[in-house]
A protein has these predicted regions:
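Internal alpha-helical scaffold of NAD(P)-dependent oxidoreductase catalytic cores
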Residues: 1-35, 41-80, 117
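Electropositive, surface-exposed helix/loop patches at the edges of structured domains
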Residues: 24-27, 101-105, 155
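Short, basic/aromatic-enriched C-terminal tail that caps enzymatic domains
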Residues: 141-155
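Generic detector of well-ordered alpha-helical packing
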Residues: 40-41, 53, 107, 144
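A generic structural signal for secondary-structure junctions
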Residues: 17-20, 72-76, 86, 90, ...
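Interdomain hinge/lid region at the active-site interface
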Residues: 33, 83-144
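Short acidic/histidine-centered micro-motifs embedded in hydrophobic/aromatic stretches
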Residues: 56, 70-74, 126-133, 150
Length: 155
């Protein structure tokens, strides 16, 4: 990620190529740092969610290694940007592959299971609140990725 004048970045391409696998121009000066912080924000939240989820799996009696192996090939492990966002909300397609109402139902059941095993569910509770808030403004039948649209319109 590089911020600044595109011509300046191109003039340094050999340097960037030597230290990075991929160079993406992200905007004017300062955009590189902002992008780095936003990227690390998501990475650390994903790390915390992964830890909470694998702890949940362990508490309900699942094998952590088997669960992690399975999840690494599903939307849970591959991430929304690699699976759903590009074909759904970022393509302006909010037709439901997995509607918000179903996300709430599954979160309700998972949170109930977590509660019965005294498992941490901080991120589950936060996610449910976000989906419920979106449902309350009439977005329940839209694809679960529509929470991005909800957040963009809510600010």
């Amino acid at each position: 990620m590089a911020g600044g004048d595109l011509a300046d970045i191109e003039s340094l391409r050999n340097v960037f190529d030597a230290i990075a696998n991929k160079i993406v121009h992200v905007g004017p000066v300062g955009s590189g740092l902002k992008t780095k912080l936003v990227n690390n924000y998501m990475a650390m939240i994903n790390n915390a969610v992964t830890a909470e989820t694998l702890s949940f799996a362990h508490r309900v009696g699942l094998d952590i290694d088997a669960t992690a192996e399975l999840m690494s090939s599903t939307t849970a492990g591959l991430g929304q940007l690699n699976t759903n966002y590009t074909k759904k909300v970022l393509a302006n397609d909010l037709s439901p592959d997995f509607p918000i109402t179903m996300a709430i139902k599954d979160l309700d059941m998972a949170i109930e299971l977590a509660n019965s095993f005294d498992s941490e569910r901080l991120f589950g509770d936060l996610a449910k609140k976000l989906f419920v808030d979106a449902e309350e403004v009439g977005m329940g039948k839209l694809d679960q990725t529509a929470i991005l649209t909800y957040l963009l319109n809510d600010q």
